[in-house]
Amino acid sequence: MTYQKKHQHLRIELASPEQIRNWAERVLPNGEIVGQVTKPYTLHYKTHKPEKDGLFCEKIFGPIKSGICACGKYQGIEKKKENIKFCEQCGVEFIESRIRRYRMGYIKLACSVTHVWYLKRLPSYIANLLAKPLKELESLVYCDLFLARPITKKPTLLKLQGLFKYEDQSWKDIFPRFFSPRGFEVFQNREIATGGDAIQKQLTNLNLQNVINLAHLEWKEFAEQKSTGNEWEDRKIQRRKDLLVRRIKLAKHFIQTNIKPEWMVLSLLPVLPPELRPMIELGEGELITSDLNELYRRVIYRNNTLLDFLARSGSTPGGLVVCQKRLVQEAVDALIDNGIRGQPMKDSHNRPYKSFSDLIEGKEGRFRENLLGKRVDYSGRSVIVVGPFLPLHQCGLPREMAIELFQAFVIRGLIGRNFAPNLRAAKTMIQNKEPIIWKVLQEVMQGHPILLNRAPTLHRLGIQAFQPILVNGRAIHLHPLVCGGFNADFDGDQMAVHIPLSLEAQAEARLLMLSHKNLLSPATGEPISVPSQDMLLGLYILTIENNQGIYGNKYNPSKKYDSKKKFSQIPYFSSYDNVFRALQQKQIYLHSSLWLRWQINLRIITLLNQEGPIEIQYKSFGNSFQIYEHYQLRKNKNQEIISTYICTTAGRILFNQQIEEAIQGTYKASLKQKTFVQKIEKNG
């Protein structure tokens, strides 16, 4: 973790062996250096206490209980680092137990091990820098091949150079006759290398500036060449040019960041703090442990075996040492990225171990779940579906989600109203889904807005407040008009639900963030809650009519059409209710033409040119009917209008009623607001 200009940020880079040692090593007040894990043990099988120098050693990682050493002694914890005390008998410091979450250890490897990320991940950084095929390097890393004269600048006794198989050469039988066992071991380590040692020596021998210069010259030669006319050759040249560009970029990055390429080969293996790879005791002495502990144990077992072989190298066959080096490499590979080479290491239940890469990568890994994005309490997530029956400021919240989000409020309501005596009883009622909890939940939700958010939140309308209502199912119901602000549609989009807890957050949500108060785009000022797509198509179908005016067809055929029967006349209705009743009884249909009695004081919008009546009918008492294309006027003998009828459809009447109710509701709300403001001014 580094700090730059007072902004905290995280930078991931290669660590040198010295840096790994500094992470883990400490000097105790008695001068003893601790930090190296040498034993593959975890907890003692009888006492369940950490084994000394093992993966949970209190001397290395700190005490399990604050202020209590491994002997069981207790001393007060000193806040100043200079005054920290430790037990002279067991070497454990008297400090807080939470240090076990931060303090690291390390394993000193008997042979260098190549970091599998930089070898097997694409692109392979080691293959790019060394300009060698990946398969060739893999054979070298896993000890299938040997490298003669890994350091070419020094004089050599061997005429061999490059890769070869160990058993194919006769020198291994000839040279031991001229050297002592110790001398032959020194000669072999200098002249021949395999495994991570061979890779490390080649990387150490690299001159990065020369790599850049040579790659640049080769790229210029290819750039000056013209097309060969052969598509296969041109592709081959282009791939080579791309490889040279990657090599130049990689070498420049190493130079700029002051990182040495040989650090891609490990000689010290960091051991994570114990709290990040816990071992938990269940009932009856049963233990469960993190997979990392098993992988660390395997590394230590194989590393200690290799140390024993090297300690008695005179009596150990060379092939056995080489085989053990390969096993150490494979154990470290499994710890870092299990299964990257094919078949993963598995436990006794044939389940692959979870390696370090599995813990940090992916959606549920350490970075995406705990660092880049964090799980939030009092929040949920579900798919959205259309809810056209909802007002603009409401949303439908599934019962299952609502009872989980508002559980704390429901529990308080149950206990406060004496429906439950305590917390456990209230939780039991919720788990059993007793009917009373839904009533309490509805009362809690009435005055509590919720926040809906759809990622990515690119502007302030990406998160809006709504008044929740309970709905069945598992999907969130949303009014289609608010989709514009969220840039959402109903093809599987998901939205997050958040509960504002503090009074300030609830007030902000209610006063500023409710959806019906965010109708304009903050960027352009234009309306953003406008009908589109399905809504426009639905409005068109609702308001369309089969015949335009009485010219199209003066009479509509009835459902039971018979050419011999007379056409039924267009029906007359005196109110909206009569129309809806007839529509419900299927006497008329949405697109059926009808005459609706209109209020006399409402103006009828006609064409700009004054329209003349199509027909005028006179009655015996002097009353008259003036029939126009879209309306009728009934007048008395004094030519005063008695009634007005307009030609429309049931669908248009339904649409008009919704518009009227919306306008009246807005008008009433504005009157209430004015009255409220006037009262405040008077009281002020």
Swiss-Prot record:
Catalyzed reactions: RNA(n) + a ribonucleoside 5'-triphosphate = RNA(n+1) + diphosphate
Cofactor(s) this protein requires: Mg(2+); Zn(2+)
UniProt remark on cofactor binding: Binds 1 Mg(2+) ion per subunit. Binds 1 Zn(2+) ion per subunit.
Superkingdom per UniProt: Eukaryota
Function: DNA-dependent RNA polymerase catalyzes the transcription of DNA into RNA using the four ribonucleoside triphosphates as substrates.
Family: Belongs to the RNA polymerase beta' chain family. RpoC1 subfamily.
Protein name, entry field: DNA-directed RNA polymerase subunit beta'
Natural source organism: Marchantia polymorpha
